[in-house]
């Protein structure tokens, strides 16, 4: 196997990953190199056309990702936009992120994958992905290939110039999409500043900017969302990052929607998951789904902290 992934290789890898079987370390390296090539050409505000199905956090819940594709349609038949947090917490971060990256490399025009706050070296060392890579490969190389790749993921996407999609939320340092386009994203997620805020902030019932209980990013009120949408000619901010019990939740007088796509989050929260389908004319509908039937989860001791639910 050379360092070139042919279409035939990719199809075979995708087939294997669909069965929840991991790739070899060498195959992952080849895949990540190819993905970097593709992602390096994408913008900080990646343009996406409708129709497209928008998804929130997946967090290594591989069987629920399979359920998501069953409900929403297979890739590439359905166009997808994922808003980050592919790894950590679930038991199958390796298979989940490898599959999404393989689909991106195989069908680059049909799937968009954004960066979430968990697509970071620091966070993955605490919340499970690093340990899982060590357990499944016997060393940290695969973790390194993926976390290096994460620096290339676009920060936000813009669907038909109107619906702005990102993982976390708005930033007091950013008024316009051009400010986002000007950021240097090829780095670890910083502890503060605009790039950090886009991946960490949350909408709030209180107006204005507030200090985030997460220790990174800000909270922002309806006044902020309305101003941002008006300034940038947007109809909606679509984001993920927060567990919502019904899988989706409107706030800020429908200026913001939260979408969460990991059902029964952490295998214990009891929430539904959802997808937002945008049709040819940007009309939205939500599809809710429950966890895939489980055939015995692995008995893994969980040592990850419960903070940041």
UniProtKB/Swiss-Prot annotation:
<dbReference type="GO" id="GO:0007059">
    <property type="term" value="P:chromosome segregation"/>
</dbReference>
<dbReference type="GO" id="GO:0160232">
    <property type="term" value="C:INTAC complex"/>
</dbReference>
<comment type="similarity">
    <text>Belongs to the PPP phosphatase family. PP-2A subfamily.</text>
</comment>
<feature type="binding site">
    <location>
        <position position="85"/>
    </location>
    <ligand>
        <name>Mn(2+) 1</name>
    </ligand>
</feature>
<feature type="binding site">
    <location>
        <position position="167"/>
    </location>
    <ligand>
        <name>Mn(2+) 2</name>
    </ligand>
</feature>
<dbReference type="GO" id="GO:0051225">
    <property type="term" value="P:spindle assembly"/>
</dbReference>
<dbReference type="GO" id="GO:0007460">
    <property type="term" value="P:R8 cell fate commitment"/>
</dbReference>
<keyword id="KW-0479">Metal-binding</keyword>
<dbReference type="GO" id="GO:0005634">
    <property type="term" value="C:nucleus"/>
</dbReference>
<dbReference type="GO" id="GO:0000159">
    <property type="term" value="C:protein phosphatase type 2A complex"/>
</dbReference>
<feature type="binding site">
    <location>
        <position position="85"/>
    </location>
    <ligand>
        <name>Mn(2+) 2</name>
    </ligand>
</feature>
<dbReference type="GO" id="GO:0007406">
    <property type="term" value="P:negative regulation of neuroblast proliferation"/>
</dbReference>
<keyword id="KW-0378">Hydrolase</keyword>
<dbReference type="GO" id="GO:0005737">
    <property type="term" value="C:cytoplasm"/>
</dbReference>
<dbReference type="GO" id="GO:0008420">
    <property type="term" value="F:RNA polymerase II CTD heptapeptide repeat phosphatase activity"/>
</dbReference>
<dbReference type="GO" id="GO:0090443">
    <property type="term" value="C:FAR/SIN/STRIPAK complex"/>
</dbReference>
<keyword id="KW-0464">Manganese</keyword>
<dbReference type="GO" id="GO:0007465">
    <property type="term" value="P:R7 cell fate commitment"/>
</dbReference>
<dbReference type="GO" id="GO:0019208">
    <property type="term" value="F:phosphatase regulator activity"/>
</dbReference>
<dbReference type="GO" id="GO:0048477">
    <property type="term" value="P:oogenesis"/>
</dbReference>
<feature type="binding site">
    <location>
        <position position="59"/>
    </location>
    <ligand>
        <name>Mn(2+) 1</name>
    </ligand>
</feature>
<feature type="binding site">
    <location>
        <position position="117"/>
    </location>
    <ligand>
        <name>Mn(2+) 2</name>
    </ligand>
</feature>
<feature type="modified residue" description="Leucine methyl ester">
    <location>
        <position position="309"/>
    </location>
</feature>
<dbReference type="GO" id="GO:0055059">
    <property type="term" value="P:asymmetric neuroblast division"/>
</dbReference>
<dbReference type="GO" id="GO:0035331">
    <property type="term" value="P:negative regulation of hippo signaling"/>
</dbReference>
<dbReference type="GO" id="GO:0046627">
    <property type="term" value="P:negative regulation of insulin receptor signaling pathway"/>
</dbReference>
<dbReference type="GO" id="GO:0007099">
    <property type="term" value="P:centriole replication"/>
</dbReference>
<dbReference type="GO" id="GO:0009416">
    <property type="term" value="P:response to light stimulus"/>
</dbReference>
<dbReference type="GO" id="GO:0007168">
    <property type="term" value="P:receptor guanylyl cyclase signaling pathway"/>
</dbReference>
<dbReference type="InterPro" id="IPR047129">
    <property type="entry name" value="PPA2-like"/>
</dbReference>
<dbReference type="GO" id="GO:0048190">
    <property type="term" value="P:wing disc dorsal/ventral pattern formation"/>
</dbReference>
<dbReference type="GO" id="GO:0005829">
    <property type="term" value="C:cytosol"/>
</dbReference>
<dbReference type="InterPro" id="IPR029052">
    <property type="entry name" value="Metallo-depent_PP-like"/>
</dbReference>
<dbReference type="GO" id="GO:0045752">
    <property type="term" value="P:positive regulation of Toll signaling pathway"/>
</dbReference>
<dbReference type="GO" id="GO:0007098">
    <property type="term" value="P:centrosome cycle"/>
</dbReference>
<dbReference type="InterPro" id="IPR004843">
    <property type="entry name" value="Calcineurin-like_PHP_ApaH"/>
</dbReference>
<feature type="active site" description="Proton donor">
    <location>
        <position position="118"/>
    </location>
</feature>
<keyword id="KW-0488">Methylation</keyword>
<dbReference type="GO" id="GO:0016239">
    <property type="term" value="P:positive regulation of macroautophagy"/>
</dbReference>
<dbReference type="InterPro" id="IPR006186">
    <property type="entry name" value="Ser/Thr-sp_prot-phosphatase"/>
</dbReference>
<dbReference type="GO" id="GO:0160240">
    <property type="term" value="P:RNA polymerase II transcription initiation surveillance"/>
</dbReference>
<dbReference type="GO" id="GO:0005654">
    <property type="term" value="C:nucleoplasm"/>
</dbReference>
